[in-house]
UniProtKB/Swiss-Prot annotation:
Residues 33-134 form the BTB domain. This is BTB/POZ domain-containing protein KCTD4. One of its GO terms (molecular function) is identical protein binding. Pfam families: BTB_2, KCTD4_C. One of its GO terms (biological process) is protein homooligomerization. InterPro entries: BTB/POZ_dom, KCTD4_C, SKP1/BTB/POZ_sf, T1-type_BTB. It comes from the Eukaryota. PANTHER family: BTB_POZ DOMAIN-CONTAINING PROTEIN KCTD4, POTASSIUM CHANNEL TETRAMERIZATION DOMAIN-CONTAINING.
Amino acid sequence: MERKINRREKEKEYEGKHNSLEDTDQGKNCKSTLMTLNVGGYLYITQKQTLTKYPDTFLEGIVNGKILCPFDADGHYFIDRDGLLFRHVLNFLRNGELLLPEGFRENQLLAQEAEFFQLKGLAEEVKSRWEKEQLTPRETTFLEITDNHDRSQGLRIFCNAPDFISKIKSRIVLVSKSRLDGFPEEFSISSNIIQFKYFIKSENGTRLVLKEDNTFVCTLETLKFEAIMMALKCGFRLLTSLDCSKGSIVHSDALHFIK
């Protein structure tokens, strides 16, 4: 009876060691198939077979030792390219097709990345996508800034693109220098319109305040300047300006932009 038990225990011990060796080998094999790339400061972990999917490309050359590539301080391959755009390059290698998020507007930059990594298929798909976008008529975005604060009607900002209105709101909170925890509802009319009604005159110029407690938000000139600069940064161009001969664009009674 004791002999049978001892024999069984030895069999279990052998099986345990055997399984342990298998797990170790599998772990080593798994690690050997993975590769970490540092692309412009962004780390990407992927399988070698993904990077070698297309022969005679930059990434395939690195994996197979055809191309010498420097290492970063942690021993990862370092590629001095756009780290954010590389995710689209990697997704192309994984999926075999170009899949981009809605509203993607960096086709030319992505085309340059495709050329660098020698991915002809990706370059062709980016080019095709860009050509289709050029043929598709774009909806005109309209922005109007009207200043009637002298007539107690305040400053009104209208834009048919709600995302621009959201950017203006965020900017106003920022320039208020911590006076606001968030954008006040009293200024919001809709997703397309902001109406700043409450201004008081002071030695430093006309000041935008909150209705409830007269908390100072920013000056009228700052408000208009930030809206104008935001418009220009977002690609709007000035169409008309009604300024009553006051000179600076900031003092205009009405500004109309299109994009």
